[in-house]
């Protein structure tokens, strides 16, 4: 009697902020797990996304963007989280953007050169490159930087060549038992996912107006007798002016954020959601390591 083989491994998705790492993760999983927004630093936790297909289970670690600015406690912790996730994986997907190459990309590359894991280079947003003639020389430049396992031009947004990345990942998964049941897509708690959804809506509807000094704490997450969830979210900002910005004129902004967040939660939790949001000023939290620990920013380090 033959025992079927199974394959399982951890894959880190790394790159500087805003190159499309979260969008790629969501595409690889076939649904939204990691929050995506055009603002840098939207991913603050190492979210694990799990994709199981037959005998193959790929466990994706979505890192915060490695970036050079290390002044604030939150930035230092995010950089530490990103660096630590590179160290304990079977494979790394290094995401860069089109024909752009920055000192931050160089810094990530230097960290990868120190590691032992093979690296796939995903050149994202190739559909946005205006001068297509620039692409080939740039790919040749990238190929000369490191001995990459493969270099794949992709568009995480449209899905172009994402299946190629997935196929390379499957091919390099070691023989191992699966860590998670096959219907799992993330090991993050519903409470954590609720806070991420609210934070995404804050980023989306406040855009460049709102600095990164905003976080979300879920104060209450309980099942109700209607078969759904009652969720209370506390939005923490650093200044009174930011609080007014989040609330908006006559509460219009926070109402929109709440409506959109509730829709996403209901889709993710497959149950009705009653969501209430509050905004509170807590000055200096992004500089205070103790406050960051209490908000779960270092729970996995």
Swiss-Prot record:
Residues 15-22 are annotated as: G1. Keywords: Cell inner membrane, Cell membrane, Cytoplasm, GTP-binding, Membrane, Nucleotide-binding, Ribosome biogenesis, RNA-binding, rRNA-binding. Residues 124-127 are annotated as: G4. Residues 62-65 are annotated as: G3. GO terms for cellular component: cytosol; plasma membrane. Residues 154-156 are annotated as: G5. Residues 206-283 form the KH type-2 domain. Monomer. Belongs to the TRAFAC class TrmE-Era-EngA-EngB-Septin-like GTPase superfamily. Era GTPase family. This is GTPase Era. It comes from Shigella flexneri serotype 5b (strain 8401).
């Amino acid at each position: 009697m033959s025992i079927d083989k199974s394959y399982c491994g951890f894959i880190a998705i790394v790159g500087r902020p805003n190159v499309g790492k979260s969008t790629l993760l969501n595409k690889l999983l076939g649904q939204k797990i990691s929050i995506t927004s055009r603002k840098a630093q939207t991913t603050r936790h190492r979210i694990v996304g799990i994709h199981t297909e037959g005998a193959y289970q790929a466990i994706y670690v979505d890192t915060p963007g490695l970036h050079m600015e290390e002044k604030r406690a939150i930035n230092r912790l995010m950089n530490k989280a990103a660096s630590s996730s590179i160290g304990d994986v079977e494979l790394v997907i290094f995401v860069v953007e089109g024909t752009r190459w920055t000192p931050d990309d160089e810094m990530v590359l230097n960290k990868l050169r120190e590691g032992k894991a093979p690296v796939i280079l995903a050149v994202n947003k190739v559909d946005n490159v205006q001068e297509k003639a620039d692409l080939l020389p740039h790919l040749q430049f990238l190929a000369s930087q490191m001995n990459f396992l493969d270099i794949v031009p992709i568009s995480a947004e449209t899905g172009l060549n994402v299946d190629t990345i997935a196929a390379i990942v499957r091919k390099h998964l070691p023989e191992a038992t699966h860590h998670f049941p096959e219907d799992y897509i993330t090991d993050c708690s519903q409470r954590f996912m609720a806070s991420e959804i609210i934070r995404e809506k804050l980023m989306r509807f406040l855009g460049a107006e709102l600095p990164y000094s905003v976080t979300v704490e879920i104060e209450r997450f309980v099942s109700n007798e209607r078969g759904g969830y009652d969720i209370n979210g506390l939005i923490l900002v650093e200044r009174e002016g930011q609080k007014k910005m989040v609330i908006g004129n006559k509460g219009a902004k926070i109402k929109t954020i709440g409506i959109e967040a509730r829709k996403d939660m209901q889709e993710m939790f497959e149950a009705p959601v009653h969501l209430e949001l509050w905004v509170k000023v807590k000055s200096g939290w992004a500089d205070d390591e103790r406050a960051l620990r209490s908000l779960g920013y270092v729970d996995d380090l």
